[in-house]
Amino acid sequence: MIIDILKQSKKQIYDHYLDYVSSKSTVFEEDKQKIVDLFTQKIKGPIIYREYYRGSQEYCVKTLDATVIYNSNDEAEIILATASDITVNWHEQNSLKQQAQRDSLTHLYNLEAGKYIIDEYIKKNPKQQNALIVLDIDHFKEVNDTYGHLVGNELLIALAKYLLFHTNPNDIVIRMGGDEFVVFLKNVHDDLTYPCNQLMSHLNEISLSHHGIHFSISMGVYTFSNEQNFDNIFKIADDALYHSKRNGRNCYTIKYQK
């Protein structure tokens, strides 16, 4: 792609490419401004942008770079733009990234990925009231010892699906390891008894290959509304979990920010 911009002002160049990109409906909406900024030298390339195939919901991924060539009077004369299709490599890299963020058994976020996502969310929403739930399966070792680890794994997978079903799509569910899970509830109200009761009261919906298995969970909950980090809020919620354990299990304990 070669565009002659001789004697055009920067404003004219900007408007020209803004119109061009805005009218190119196949480019992802959130990527259009990057292309405009690249051509007007507001950012350096290469950039990555996504573009739908015409008449299809499938898309390709491309890199785009632009170089401005100046004449002897130091006036911008030509923009040379080069694009390369990196769709296959991009999807492979994205797939590997997704795998690195997920627990291999339950496909929930693993601790490292979940911790990072929660910390970033709190930084961006420091005044919002959120809650962290730490939970585990009561007497999970007995399930493994009695029925075997395959059944134990089946229970972990079923509980992971259960937690996803009974939380909002924007909430974050993490498998910490073993039988311990974390649920991060975004933008909650003061009264958390309803969501906690919902999680506790529908466990009988979980069906396993061994129908005779009965289990319960214990939960610790911490709600807060200022900027904190995952390690701090996890410690408080984890303390609440152990309070539930000392109170006989199959219950939850809520701690509120002081």
Q: What feature does the model see in each segment?
A:
Residues 3-25, 33:
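PAS and related sensory helical modules
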Residues 40-65, 75-77:
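Per-ARNT-Sim (PAS) sensory domains and their PAS-associated C-terminal
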Residues 37-40, 157-227, 232, 254:
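GGDEF/GGEEF active-site signature
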Residues 24-50:
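Terminal output helix/cap of sensory domains in signal transduction proteins
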Residues 72, 145, 222-253, 258:
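Catalytic-core segments of nucleotide cyclases and related cyclic-nucleotide turnover enzymes
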